[in-house]
């Protein structure tokens, strides 16, 4: 598709999120985020999932679609499999995008997915976030975007490639997703790995898109205010196991890191000048394996044992892995 045709027919996007309780500081920053989406141009369709206090009221105030019922795990955390499936069924956009409900977006986000969608029909767009302390409600009157962007560039901190807060993807990309709990680690890394395994173009939009993450603690979870407590929970351990669904032995043997892709694993970069191949993914792949010599040795041993197995043994091994 040519550049001219992409401006003549701009693809729409369905943004979806699952907010937490609209209480205290979390309530303030979620309202900031969602209101920023409502003023974005081109205008997205917005779907809010879940029945947390305040969600239905925010949806009604801004005229957004609200879906209260979402499948959850035994700890009451929404499952991304159901969120993504419902978003595609209910949304009208040719592009679908999950966004964490504390992320402020600007017009450059919408402009970026238009460019990527014109370039590829099978893609995932991600990008690094900029952390910023925001304690008060944002005033969206006047030139709020210019002022907030200036504050983010001046005072904010660009986060590492492991922090992934939005996923803009072509409709139908994620046809099958395991029962991963949202916000409980590993689920976001798996989404990148899955896109790469499907042969989709994974585009890092960091160089063209500024997204602002409003800093907060983790007191809204049942695990306490620190990430370390949550990572040690049964819920996060289950997420790690589920990322290995195609080969459960990978978790038992400690290889679930093979599915922990980050933004550095993107195949391409979106820049003001265009979309270019990203050589960083090669370095990331090398680093992923070279930093785990023991794991590499185990994988090599496993590969050799499979290649040397007799046909009958291979069949038994295959049945065992199912």
What are these regions (language model features)?
Residues 42, 61-63, 198:
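Short, structured coil segments at secondary-structure junctions
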Residues 12-14, 19, 180-322:
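C-terminal catalytic/acceptor-binding lobe
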Residues 21-29:
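A short, glycine/small-residue-rich beta-strand->loop->alpha-helix junction that serves as a flexible
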Residues 88, 104-193:
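Conserved catalytic core of nucleotide-sugar-dependent glycosyltransferases
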Residues 44-51, 125-126:
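Short, hydrophobic beta-strand segments that form beta-sheet elements in well-ordered domains
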Residues 31-44:
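Short, acidic, metal-binding catalytic loop of nucleotide-sugar glycosyltransferases
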Residues 20-22, 52-55, 73, 102-104, ...:
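Short, solvent-exposed loop/turn segments at secondary-structure junctions
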Residues 48-99, 106-107:
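Active-site-proximal specificity loops/subdomain of glycosyltransferases
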């Amino acid at each position: 598709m040519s550049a001219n045709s992409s401006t003549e027919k701009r693809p729409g996007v369905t943004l979806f999120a699952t907010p937490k309780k609209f209480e205290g500081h979390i309530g303030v920053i979620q309202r900031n985020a969602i209101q920023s989406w409502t003023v974005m141009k081109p205008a997205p369709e917005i779907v809010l999932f879940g029945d947390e206090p305040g969600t239905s009221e925010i949806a009604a105030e801004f005229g957004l679609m609200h879906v209260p019922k979402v499948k959850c795990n035994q700890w009451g955390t929404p499952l991304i499999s159901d969120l993504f499936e419902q978003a595609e069924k209910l949304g009208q956009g040719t592009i679908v995008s999950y966004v964490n409900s504390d992320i402020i977006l600007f017009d450059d986000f919408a402009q970026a997915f238009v460019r990527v969608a014109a370039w590829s029909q099978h893609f995932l767009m991600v990008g690094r976030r900029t952390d910023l302390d925001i304690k008060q409600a944002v005033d969206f009157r006047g030139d709020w975007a210019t002022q907030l962007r200036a504050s983010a560039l001046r005072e904010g901190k660009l986060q590492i490639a492991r922090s992934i807060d939005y996923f803009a993807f072509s409709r139908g990309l994620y046809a099958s997703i395991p029962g991963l709990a949202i916000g409980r680690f590993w689920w976001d890394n798996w989404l990148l790995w899955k896109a790469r395994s499907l042969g989709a173009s994974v585009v890092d939009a960091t160089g063209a898109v500024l997204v602002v993450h409003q800093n907060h603690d983790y007191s809204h979870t049942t695990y306490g205010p620190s990430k370390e407590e949550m990572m040690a929970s049964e819920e996060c351990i289950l997420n790690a196991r589920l990322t290995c669904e195609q080969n459960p032995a990978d978790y038992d043997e400690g290889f679930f890191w093979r599915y922990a892709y980050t933004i550095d694993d993107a195949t391409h970069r979106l820049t003001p000048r265009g979309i270019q191949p990203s050589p960083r993914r090669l370095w990331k792949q090398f680093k992923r394996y070279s930093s785990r010599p023991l794991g590499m040795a185990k994988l090599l041993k496993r590969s050799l044992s499979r290649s040397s197995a007799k046909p009958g043994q291979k069949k038994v091994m295959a049945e065992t892995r199912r």
